[in-house]
Amino acid sequence: MSFTWPLDPQDLFVERYPQMTLGLPVDEVDAVRAAVTEMWPDRPGGWVYEWSALAARHAEAGHHRLAAQAYGWAKFPSLADDPKRTALARQVEQYVLAAPGFPVEFERRTLTVPYRGGDAALPIHLMAAPGLPADAPVVLASGGVDSWKTDLHGMWEQLALALPARLLLFDLAGTGETTHLPMTPDGGAEVIAGLVAFARTIGDGGVGHFGISMGGYYSARTGLTGSVDASVVLGGPVERAFAPGRGFAFGMEGIVGNALGFDAMPSTAEREDAFAAFDLRPLLDQDANGPMLVVNGTEDVHVPVDDTLVFEGRRDTRVELIPDTGHCAISRFGEAMAVITPWLKDTLIG
């Protein structure tokens, strides 16, 4: 189930340019930006066409990591049609070809976890600094509804090299290589519970959870329930973001609608009904949380600042708002990671 929707591609460049240039040369991003005139058609001037052309040039030159990054933007922001799904498949192909050159230990495997009375399979990536002992803790990590485990490789790589822990990287239900499972609050959490259980068997038993954007919703859940030993919430929606009457920016209404499993743009009533189930107020009213770090930028257009401030004053919880930056502090990401990395190390390892 998927759908396309009216979306000005230049709006995506406005919002995501800092993220695009984290993994690709500025001049290449600028060239694609100048060439793109429409979002969905797979033809010259189309988003997927122009990004895929850049990716193909890198692939032909043997620059597989850059090709994977470019194909990642080709399939952005949602697997709404066949050209986007093709771009994802090509991204995975190029990423696997690039893996032998990564400066980290890397393994791609498929795990089977309990899901809704049966089982579900999903690809995961394990990443660690070279020579990391087998008995190190494990940190689950994911992006959100539109930026997934392979897209964020550069960030994961830096974290793995800085943190004496093994990363277990995955895509949320409804996204990336897990789009065969619709995003629901409990179903998505059940998948993550299975990953946590697996993670406890492959290291010293200690498990952290680092969620970015919608991934932060799920890391807030694991943190508030105390089901992991350290939880990082970066730009995560928890309560006000799911309230009736909220607005959307930069195409997020269609991105979220696809992740939730709709086959056409949901009506306001349909979306608000789906959102109501995500509200974490019942968990926020409890006092069962483990150690938590909650971070975001003050100028987030997607997640109200209240969804960060609501954690202030909680036991074993640190809150950091980074000024003059937006969703997930993307334009000041180094500052965010300078808080997150040592906190994870101190909390999981001491």
Sequence positions of predicted segments:
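N-terminal cap/lid segment of alpha/beta-hydrolase-fold proteins
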Residues: W51, A87-G131
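The serine-hydrolase catalytic nucleophile loop
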Residues: V145-Q158, D306
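Short beta-strand/loop motif that positions the catalytic acidic residue
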Residues: D287-A288, V294-N296
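Alpha/beta-hydrolase active-site loop
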Residues: P182-I202
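Conserved alpha/beta-hydrolase "acid-adjacent" motif
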Residues: V301-D307
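Hydrolase active-site cap/lid region
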Residues: R221-D273
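Conserved alpha/beta-hydrolase
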Residues: L161-E177
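Catalytic histidine-centered segment of alpha/beta-hydrolase-like enzymes
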Residues: S78, T325-M337
